[in-house]
Design a protein with these regions (language model features):
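PLP-dependent enzyme catalytic core of the Aspartate aminotransferase-like
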Residues: 53, 57, 61, 65, ...
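N-terminal "arm"/small-domain region of PLP-dependent enzymes with the aminotransferase-like
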Residues: 2, 7-72, 200
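PLP-dependent aminotransferase class I/II
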Residues: 235-237, 241-312
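Conserved PLP-anchoring active-site segment centered on the Schiff-base-forming lysine
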Residues: 116-135
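Conserved PLP-binding catalytic core of the aspartate aminotransferase-like
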Residues: 298-339, 349, 353-354, 361-363, ...
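Conserved N-terminal alpha-helix of the aminotransferase class I/II PLP-enzyme fold
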Residues: 61, 69-108
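Active-site phosphate-binding strand-loop segment of PLP-dependent enzymes
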Residues: 149-204
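Conserved active-site segment immediately N-terminal to the catalytic lysine
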Residues: 199, 206, 210, 218-238, ...
């Protein structure tokens, strides 16, 4: 056998070439630990804490109380030792708030999407998926082994065509409600009409809508009048508006029962940590008690969009498209130098040529925060960064 093929020092040598290619394209990423107290950052617009509840004392205390009662970890699968009374309370109360009959907690929002899609469709079935759907949906579609048709963004007619022109046993139409990069809103009522006409199920990822969309922050599905419909299922994350971690599938009781029996990311994963469940439940109760949080988050998002001359957002996500990845990286770094943390989205997260600053509005932002962002962004876009068109 060729010595080159048996030398253990060369089996991963190809990684270096891939890293060089990503660096040349401006697509290298790095992990930067966030300090408990960051003296350089005066304003965080990078995280997804849309309601400002991650640091709320009641939410923190709810997590601490869960630790004291239920220990540090859930210790096993939800079907073994990983379910607590907190999980059951969270499922019942979040389902009630969003208008669904039942809910099932998963360890992450990613796992919720993987679990529900791979449990609802299989070979012989059809999945119709928006081209801008989250990576967890993309991966779930691949794992399902169903036929997958990716349709142009927000084009209901393309969904209709996909459902009309194929033979299939069952159909699932999948979409984000609020899209994570652009912050735009899917036409849920129209999608539901088309899906129902063809006997399919509509699955909506509400990660960026829960807590922000709707008069009470109940989400886009409920705001569209679709919560509780027998052919509508939703997923949510507990890591954004609820300031914690985890995910949930919401829908008819039959869907919950089916997932308990078949969803591999539920059956074979350790249950959500009690502290995360407790914190999410504490945050949910704050939202229920003060539904104005949703409107305040949306209002601040509109203000940030006006400052940035960005499209009007549907929820809390504000997208400032700059084009080249180098330009977006430089602008994000310049904002940080002025005390403002913003997210930088580059391919493959967004399409080539649309690298951007991605801002997350929060319900607890102040007028002074908005003014600080305006100053930082103006300075960032005025500074040359050695990239054509940076000014």
């Amino acid at each position: 056998m060729d010595q080159q093929l048996t030398d253990p020092t060369t089996c991963l040598a190809w990684l270096e070439g891939h890293a060089r290619a990503r660096r040349a394209a401006g697509l290298r990423r790095s992990v930067r630990p966030r300090p408990a107290v960051d003296n350089e950052i005066r304003l965080d617009l990078a995280g997804n804490d849309y309601l400002g509840l991650a640091q709320h004392p009641d939410v923190i205390e709810a997590g601490v109380a869960a630790l004291r009662v239920w220990d540090a970890g859930s210790t096993g699968s939800r079907l073994v030792s990983g379910s607590t009374a907190l999980h059951a309370e969270l499922e019942a109360e979040l389902a009630a708030h969003t208008g669904f009959a039942s809910g099932l907690v998963f360890a992450t929002g990613y796992a919720a999407n993987l679990g529900v899609i791979t449990s609802l469709v299989a070979p012989g079935d059809l999945v119709v998926s928006d081209e801008h759907n989250h990576a967890s949906i993309v991966d779930a579609c691949r794992l399902s082994r169903a036929e997958v048709v990716v349709v142009p963004h927000l084009e209901v007619a393309a969904v209709e065509a996909a459902l009309t022109g194929r033979a299939y046993r069952r159909a699932l139409v999948v979409t984000d409600s609020v899209f994570s990069a652009d912050g735009d809103l899917a036409p849920l009522a129209e999608l539901h009409t088309v899906t129902r006409r063809h006997g399919g199920v509509l699955l909506v990822d509400e990660a960026h809508a829960l807590g922000v969309v709707g008069a009470r922050g109940e989400g886009a599905v409920a705001a569209a009048g679709l919560a509780g419909e027998p052919d509508v299922v939703a997923t949510v994350t507990l890591s954004k508006s609820l300031g914690s971690q985890g995910g949930m599938v919401l829908g008819p009781v039959a869907v919950r029962d089916h997932l308990i029996d078949t969803a591999r990311t539920f059956i074979f994963d350790t249950g959500l940590a009690p502290a995360a469940a407790g914190a999410a439940l504490g945050a949910l109760r704050l939202l229920v008690a003060d539904p104005s949080l949703a409107a305040r988050s949306r209002a601040r998002a509109q203000e940030l969009a006006r400052v940035a001359d960005a499209p009007s957002p549907a929820a809390a996500v504000v997208s400032v498209v700059l084009g080249a990845p180098e330009r977006a990286v430089a602008a994000a770094a310049a904002c940080r130098e002025h005390g403002v943390a913003v997210a930088c989205f580059r391919p493959p997260t967004v399409p080539p040529g649309t690298s951007r600053l991605r801002l997350s509005a929060r319900a607890d932002l102040t007028d002074e925060d908005v003014a600080l962002f305006a100053t930082a962004l103006s300075a960032a876009l005025a500074e040359p960064a050695g990239v054509p068109g940076m000014r």
